[in-house]
């Protein structure tokens, strides 16, 4: 039906007859001529309908926005004075010689010229996706996926599918469960990742595997998470952590170069502890120049328990952020930041304005200055490299509270005061994560997942002091977003059992949940390592948006529902009966609805 896309037309096609299919983006009557901006997925071109073409002109008079049409016409170059430099096709127009209305359109429930509510956009997503902004994002996503496949194919990786109906295993989030009709009372789980299957593929001899795969996690949502998401899953045998990072970094740098013409350069490598200490986060945004500076040694002897208490506690921390030009912050603004850090458990936010750096103690203004002497203030100014016009913000509490509160405050200050340079890209690797982390009750949990190898110790050494062990894990971070994470895997059955034991998984449970893995590890398992990227998050960054819903064709809401199809919905009672399932909650809700009526 078509010979060209609207957005591909240019001067090289002058005089040629083309056939186009698409939608009416806009129609205008000017001086007896009808002008149509015709749109398809590749762009917009201007069509001119002359009244001398009577049949075409009569049909063109009937056109309204979003009519689906087919058009035949001749490409002609616009006069220089009429060139539209805002359009990719602005040097040409089409003189219509034929027109067919394929389908008419009712008045749209969305207004493409205004901001529509998120709810309306998701409910009528098929219309929202017609907008060039959205269309461009979905096309860029397709290009990113195509690039990944091409790169990995060229580097001897095999695209291998893994099961979607599988066994529930503890990976940190709740599983989506699928009931079995054949095995009544039993359930499959939708995979949170293909983790165990890709490890089994390494044991099968497929030493370079990849898959662009759907994964599912029943967890609380936020702007960069969805219940179903797409992962670029990669696993290798006989490669070190450094080699995995090298090849995946090469993939990302070449992707950015091809799709954005941006040179990311070589990624710096930062240890987990350094990232927390300097930036208050294991995914630091290095575009933001603010850093956390430890000052416990300076404040440990002051006569102010708020500072000296944590400064002398091995589980405490006292740190500051120096904000260039921050002395201009009003008391109201400081109070707002005090409320903000309270979200993270901080009990307050002490501050010190540097009104005159050369004057030392006499040149600072602070509600806590009376507790500090000249030497302490001088040391603080030197340690933070403060200058006239700056403000120093203090955090003093447990290590966790100070790190989280000041880390979040750092990001907020960078945004509010426009200190974060959004014109640049700052990637890095974060490595040497702790193997385990404690919950509020002192129990250990795997920081990544229980199949991650510890760094440089034996199973016996790990069992002695597991809380002190680091893992051979690594995350790729770009502009404050974790875009990929991976690790060297455990390839020894004894080590795997040791990790399970530390996590409180008893031998019987090990066999029931992971017996197949422990068995497979007995048969010449190669050393293996891998990494998984979040495709949605990568494309979100490539597109310059801050919400992954913008780069998914049909996303869910933050309540994990689809406004387009009204999923999830109540199941047919006959289907539930066939599955031997009784849904008590649904009955209660139904009773409430009936009583309300």
Swiss-Prot record:
Range of residues in the leader sequence: none
Protein EC: 6.1.1.12
Keywords: Aminoacyl-tRNA synthetase, ATP-binding, Cytoplasm, Ligase, Nucleotide-binding, Protein biosynthesis
Coiled-coil ranges (or none): none
UniProt key word Nucleotide-binding: yes
Keyword Protein biosynthesis: yes
Domain of life of the native organism: Bacteria
UniProt record, GO biological process: aspartyl-tRNA aminoacylation
Chain segments carrying region Aspartate: 195-198
PROSITE patterns in alphabetical order: AA_TRNA_LIGASE_II (PS50862)
Catalytic activity: tRNA(Asp) + L-aspartate + ATP = L-aspartyl-tRNA(Asp) + AMP + diphosphate
Molecular function GO labels: aspartate-tRNA ligase activity; ATP binding; nucleic acid binding
Positions annotated to bind L-aspartate: 171, 217, 448, 489
Regions that span the bilayer: none
Residues annotated as binding ATP: 217-219, 226, 482, 534-537
Subcellular location: Cytoplasm
Function: Catalyzes the attachment of L-aspartate to tRNA(Asp) in a two-step reaction: L-aspartate is first activated by ATP to form Asp-AMP and then transferred to the acceptor end of tRNA(Asp).
Record-stated family: Belongs to the class-II aminoacyl-tRNA synthetase family. Type 1 subfamily.
NCBIfam families found in the cross-reference section: aspS_bact (TIGR00459), PRK00476.1 (NF001750)
Quaternary structure, from the entry: Homodimer.
Entry protein name: Aspartate--tRNA ligase
Organism for this UniProt entry: Photobacterium profundum (strain SS9)
């Amino acid at each position: 039906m078509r010979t060209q896309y609207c957005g591909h037309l240019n001067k090289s096609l002058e005089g040629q007859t083309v056939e186009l299919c698409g939608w009416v983006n806009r129609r205008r009557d000017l001086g007896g001529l009808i002008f149509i901006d015709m749109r398809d997925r590749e762009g917009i071109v201007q069509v001119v309908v002359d009244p001398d073409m009577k049949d075409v002109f009569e049909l063109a008079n009937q056109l309204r926005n979003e009519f689906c049409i087919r058009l035949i016409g001749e490409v002609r170059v616009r006069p220089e004075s009429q060139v539209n430099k805002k359009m990719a096709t602005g040097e040409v127009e089409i003189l219509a010689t034929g027109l067919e209305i394929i389908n008419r359109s009712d008045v749209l429930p969305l207004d493409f010229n205004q901001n529509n509510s998120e709810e309306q956009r998701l409910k009528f997503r098929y219309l929202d996706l017609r907008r060039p902004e959205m269309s461009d994002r979905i096309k860029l996503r397709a290009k990113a996926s195509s690039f990944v496949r091409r790169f990995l194919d060229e580097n001897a990786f095999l695209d291998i599918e893994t099961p979607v109906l599988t066994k529930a295993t503890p990976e940190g989030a709740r599983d989506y469960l699928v009931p079995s009709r054949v095995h009544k009372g039993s359930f499959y789980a939708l995979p949170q990742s293909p983790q165990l299957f890709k490890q089994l593929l390494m044991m099968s001899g497929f030493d370079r595997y990849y898959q662009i795969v759907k994964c599912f996690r029943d967890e609380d949502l936020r702007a960069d998470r969805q219940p179903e998401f797409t992962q670029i899953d990669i696993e290798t045998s006989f490669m070190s952590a450094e080699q995995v990072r090298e090849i995946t970094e090469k993939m990302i740098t070449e992707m950015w170069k091809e799709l954005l013409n941006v040179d990311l350069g070589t990624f710096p490598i930062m240890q987990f502890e350094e990232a927390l200490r300097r930036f208050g986060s294991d995914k630091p945004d290095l575009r933001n120049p603010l850093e956390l500076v430890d000052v416990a040694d300076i404040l440990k002897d002051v006569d102010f328990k708020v500072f000296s208490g944590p400064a002398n506690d091995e589980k405490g921390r006292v740190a500051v952020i120096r904000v260039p030009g921050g002395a201009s912050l009003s008391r109201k603004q400081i109070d707002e930041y005090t409320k903000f850090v309270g979200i993270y458990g901080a009990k307050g936010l002490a501050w010190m304005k540097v009104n005159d750096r050369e004057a030392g103690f006499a040149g600072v203004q602070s509600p806590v200055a009376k507790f500090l002497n000249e030497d302490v203030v001088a040391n603080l100014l030197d340690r933070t490299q403060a200058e006239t016009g700056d403000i120093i913000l203090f955090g003093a509490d447990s290590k966790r509270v100070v790190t989280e509160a000041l880390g979040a405050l750092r990001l907020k200050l960078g945004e509010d005061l426009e200190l974060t340079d959004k014109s640049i890209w700052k990637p890095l690797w974060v490595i040497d994560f702790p193997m385990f982390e404690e919950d509020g009750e002192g129990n250990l949990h795997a920081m990544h997942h229980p199949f991650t190898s510890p760094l440089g110790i034996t199973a016996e050494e790990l069992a002695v002091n597991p809380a002190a062990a680091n893992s051979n894990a690594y995350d790729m971070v770009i502009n404050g977003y974790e875009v990929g994470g991976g690790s060297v895997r455990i390839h020894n059955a004894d080590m795997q059992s040791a990790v399970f034991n530390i996590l409180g998984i008893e031998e019987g449970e090990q066999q029931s949940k992971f017996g197949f893995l422990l068995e497979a590890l007995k048969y010449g398992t190669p050393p293996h390592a891998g990494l998984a990227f979040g495709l949605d998050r990568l494309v979100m960054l490539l597109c310059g948006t801050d919400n992954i819903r913008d780069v998914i064709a049909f996303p869910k809401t933050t309540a994990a529902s689809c406004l387009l199809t009204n999923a999830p919905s109540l199941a047919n009672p006959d289907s539930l009966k066939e599955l031997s399932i009784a849904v008590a909650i649904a009955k209660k809700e139904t009773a409430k609805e009936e009583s309300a009526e």
